[in-house]
């Protein structure tokens, strides 16, 4: 593909506008030629941002099909509401427009099957933009795993633990899709931040696969009580019910014998964490306190606080296992979004496009990680019964080559 990528953005809410400002307009190898959102004020805001950052004028649309037809961009960032990610991506793929699709859950298995089918048919480049796969903790743990330092991996865990009550309750005013999802669905609705890095570490879809899923949800009272406590701010939500359980725990099994535990925790008071954890026969990694622990580091210790104090940020001792991107990170890269991982994922996307390389987070990854929303919804509805996990590779997982996103000295 050409050295200068003609880029477009569909979906200009908080995430889309943030990536436009933080990453896309700053790249020498990309030019944002068009933007689209159903809300015209968001379109105008984005056009101003492009003009102020680059001095160039892009074209704004409220109909993404019209934009794709008239502008014929080389690539598109899909960052609209969750419900429309796949629909827009399929339309772009069929037109030969490379797709960078933002994260979220899905709504049916057929939706994912169709996405995979269209990408396989068109061979149009597609990357699932799970930025947490590029974060410092996740890449450190992956490289320690690849070096054999943790021994054989047995279990991984992760969470999306983020107090989103104000964002959800403000959904009408801010036109945010989370409100309707939390009112009417009960599932693991945002699994990919924790599941993506775990799946890559376990080589899911490339020598390993998920085989079953069990999910249970707590009662849903966090949002209702939050609305009551802030009734003057959210009068339209007073008395409204929310289907989404306050905590959802999901357990997955793997063909390789590993287990994976996920937690969705977004409607009760708390601080942010992803709780990324890797357990092996020779040690473990815990991202919350950046702990690297190897067998024998500490003897039998019953004072848990003492052990945490001794091992706190011990991951810093293993900087040689960080990929080059993190060892040489600049302030500009850190400021591009989420401490650097947004820059790294888009750098990968554009590099793969220009060099005609396979995307490291592909359509099979997208389908596998997104389908957790649907499967968890089914399992919760069945009282926590196990449900089989579909294989979107149609058996190719046995022999597909694996590719990590950020290896040492890559």
Language-model features: locations:
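N-terminal Rossmann-like dinucleotide-binding module
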Residues: 1-53
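Conserved SAM-binding strand-loop segment of SAM-dependent methyltransferases
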Residues: 57-63
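Beta-strand-loop-alpha-helix segment that lines the small-molecule cofactor/substrate pocket
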Residues: 68-70, 75, 81-82, 86-134, ...
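Active-site beta-strand termini and strand-to-loop segments that position acidic
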Residues: 250-256, 280
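Predominantly a Rossmann-like dinucleotide-binding segment in NAD(P)-dependent oxidoreductases
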Residues: 11, 122-127, 132-242
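Glycine-rich phosphate/pyrophosphate-binding beta-alpha loops
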Residues: 262-272
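C-terminal helical cap and adjacent loop that interface with cofactors, partners, or active-site loops
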Residues: 18, 271-280, 284-289, 295-410
């Amino acid at each position: 593909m050409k050295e200068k990528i003609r880029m477009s953005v569909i979906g200009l809410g908080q995430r889309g506008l943030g990536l436009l400002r933080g990453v896309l307009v700053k790249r020498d190898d990309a030019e944002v030629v068009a933007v689209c959102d159903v809300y015209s004020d968001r379109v105008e805001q984005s056009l101003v941002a492009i003009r102020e950052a680059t001095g160039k004028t892009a074209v704004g649309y409220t109909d993404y099909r019209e934009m794709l037809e008239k502008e014929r961009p080389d690539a598109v960032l899909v960052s609209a509401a969750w419900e429309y990610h796949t629909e827009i991506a399929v339309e772009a793929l069929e037109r030969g427009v490379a797709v960078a699709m933002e994260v979220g859950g899905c709504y049916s298995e057929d939706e994912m099957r169709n996405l995979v089918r269209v990408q396989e048919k068109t061979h149009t480049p597609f990357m699932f933009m799970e930025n947490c796969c590029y974060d410092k903790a996740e890449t450190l743990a992956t490289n320690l795993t690849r070096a054999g330092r943790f021994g054989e991996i047995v279990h991984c865990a992760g969470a999306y633990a983020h107090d989103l009550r104000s964002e959800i309750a403000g959904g009408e005013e801010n036109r945010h899709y989370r409100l309707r999802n939390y009112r009417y669905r009960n599932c693991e609705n945002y699994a990919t931040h924790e599941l993506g890095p775990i799946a890559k570490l376990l080589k899911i879809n490339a020598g390993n696969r998920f085989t079953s899923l069990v999910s249970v949800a707590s009662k849903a009272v966090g949002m209702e009580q939050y609305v009551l406590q802030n009734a003057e701010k959210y009068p339209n939500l007073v008395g409204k019910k929310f289907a989404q359980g306050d905590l959802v725990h999901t357990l997955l099994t793997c063909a390789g014998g590993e287990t994976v535990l996920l937690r969705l925790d977004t409607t009760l008071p708390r601080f942010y964490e992803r709780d990324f954890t890797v357990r092996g026969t020779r040690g473990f990694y815990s991202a919350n306190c950046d702990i690297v622990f190897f067998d024998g580091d500490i003897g039998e210790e019953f004072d848990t606080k003492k052990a945490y104090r001794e091992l706190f940020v011990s991951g810093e001792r293993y900087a040689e296992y960080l990929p080059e991107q993190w060892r040489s990170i600049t302030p500009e890269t850190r400021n591009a979004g989420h401490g650097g991982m947004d820059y790294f994922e888009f750098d990968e996307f554009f590099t793969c496009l220009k060099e005609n390389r396979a995307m490291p987070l592909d359509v099979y990854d997208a389908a596998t990680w997104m389908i957790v929303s649907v499967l968890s919804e089914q399992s919760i509805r069945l009282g926590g019964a196990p449900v089989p996990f579909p294989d979107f590779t149609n058996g190719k997982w046995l022999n597909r080559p694996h590719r990590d996103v950020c290896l040492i000295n890559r």
